[in-house]
Amino acid sequence: MMRTHYCGQVTEILENQQVTVSGWVHRRRDHGGVIFIDLRDREGLVQVVVNPDNAEMFAIAERVRSEYVLKVEGKVCARTPETINPKMNTGKIEIVAESLEVLSSAEPIPFQLDDKHISEEVRLTYRYLDLRREEMQSTMRTRYRVTRSMRRYLDDNGFMDMETPILTKSTPEGARDYLVPSRTHPNKFFALPQSPQLFKQLLMMSGFDRYYQITRCFRDEDLRADRQPEFTQLDIETSFMTEEEVMNMMEGLTKTIFREGVDVNFEDDFPRMTYAEAIEKYGIDRPDLRIPLQLVDVADLLQDIDFKVFAGPAKDPMGRVAALRVPQGGKLSRKEIDDYTKYVGIYGAKGLAYIKVNDLSAGLDGLQSPIVKFFPDQAMEIMQRVGAEDGDIVFFGADNAKIVNEALGALRCKIGEDLDMIEKEWAPVWVVDFPMFEMDEKTAKMTAIHHPFTQPKATTEEILNHDEPHQMLSRAYDLVINGIEVGGGSVRIHDTHMQAAVLKMLGISDEDAQEKFGFLLNALKYGCPPHAGMAFGLDRLVMLMAKRDSIRDVIAFPKTQSAACMLTDAPGNVDNTQLADLELRFRKSLVAKDAS
């Protein structure tokens, strides 16, 4: 028998019993002719004592080093009071070894597992060692508890776990597809799915009513801290349910996985907020409601002043002038304000005007700012509107509305964190009433904010005849927690004429629509139930719940920000025979570039 108990489960209730444990040597110490080994496995550590009276076993223990794999048989004994370790679950006992076997030796490892300052490059290169660390073990257990909780909740609510294809057809979904050449169909390609969106809708048309899947998705896009080329999502679809019913059920799911995954209880219903309100008050559609700061519009007070920096955007229908009051922010130094000015520049802001409120009772004389002189008649009214008090600072953004929203929205979060203004640990919110369409600034084409299968809050005729489609709302909803979008969904289009109208609005011709989505459009003709769904980004959700900084910390074998695997050195080269089988070859310019 390799073991009777996990190391971390050997506690005082097993005192005087014989046990067998197996695991890695976490630490070995010599004390007065006795060898102590901290043995580690998935469940934790246990101290093993090797006495010198068994010369053969003691000699083996002397040769043992960190990360050797051992099997130990022995008796569980109570520690003396002065040697009890209250920080360990097994700290009241130790195993007095009667047999010790080296199952596997280990070369010196490239870093110590308890080192807190290992570079990410080293961690990812030796991921199998990195995953042995207690922090990573804990994170992966959290991920498992979350997925187990998801499955139980959905199973109990009548959902079926069903698989959808990984090799599928390339369809325009916003990001670039990963393409897979077909050997049996020369010059044709499969695509790895960006989501199971169309297949889960087809499952609703097939009568399965409630579907879920924890699935892998693939997007060939630029990476950030919360992006991976391959990622995992909990995908859900339902028939004959309104968005209100879906949101209520998904809220129940969220509360369940937080309770069972990280012991967090959400007692109250999640608040609701429209997209327009989120943008107006927080500058972003995924607001962090833990931070008690809001943007306030002041454009109407500044349209007629001579200061063009403010008056221009105030008069411009596409512009915005907004203020951000920071309570007791008047203590910020000139350098700190300059740093914040550089920060908003990342988002396109050309500067960061401000007013320090020294003494409101003194009127204009109590305001400290180089810009007050440009609007003396409006300054005090602005202070009143934003609720300024003595000791505050009020920042201003004036530009194109998109720039102001992004710059002040980001500044709001940064200041909230810098000044320790976060009021609570968790702040969930549903964001609803998203616009259906938006204009792509690069292509000047209309695009769907969520995806083209989201149902608009409009009839087919209204879609076709709408003068300002970017003002049309959709039946979409996002779940945001602490400023992170953890999931999103919508009611889907279940009428073939409405679907055709939306595709037409997006500039997709009938011919292209049939080429890309013909299978869906045909299915819509044969009795499609009203249906709605949602998807949770599992990696991002676990990152939030485990309080990690990157989703790379919650994925067992992640890619880097350049979409490479440090462990396996993927992507890699393939030989010419494989390319010939696929009837592929590289252009000479690419081969030469790779060789250089």
From Swiss-Prot:
Q: Which GO terms describe its cellular component?
A: cytoplasm
Region (Aspartate), start-end ranges? 197-200
Q: Which PROSITE patterns match?
A: AA_TRNA_LIGASE_II
Query: What top-level branch of life does the organism fall under?
Result: Bacteria
Intracellular or extracellular location(s): Cytoplasm
Main localization, broad class: cytoplasm
Q: What keywords are assigned to this protein?
A: Aminoacyl-tRNA synthetase, ATP-binding, Cytoplasm, Ligase, Nucleotide-binding, Protein biosynthesis
Task: Specify which residues bind L-aspartate according to the UniProt entry for this protein.
Answer: E173, R219, H450, R492
Q: Which GO terms describe its molecular function?
A: aspartate-tRNA ligase activity; aspartate-tRNA(Asn) ligase activity; ATP binding; nucleic acid binding
- Positions bearing the site annotation: Important for tRNA non-discrimination: H31
Q: How does it assemble?
A: Homodimer.
Main function: Aspartyl-tRNA synthetase with relaxed tRNA specificity since it is able to aspartylate not only its cognate tRNA(Asp) but also tRNA(Asn). Reaction proceeds in two steps: L-aspartate is first activated by ATP to form Asp-AMP and then transferred to the acceptor end of tRNA(Asp/Asn).
What's the protein here called? Aspartate--tRNA(Asp/Asn) ligase
Annotated source species: Hydrogenovibrio crunogenus (strain DSM 25203 / XCL-2) (Thiomicrospira crunogena)
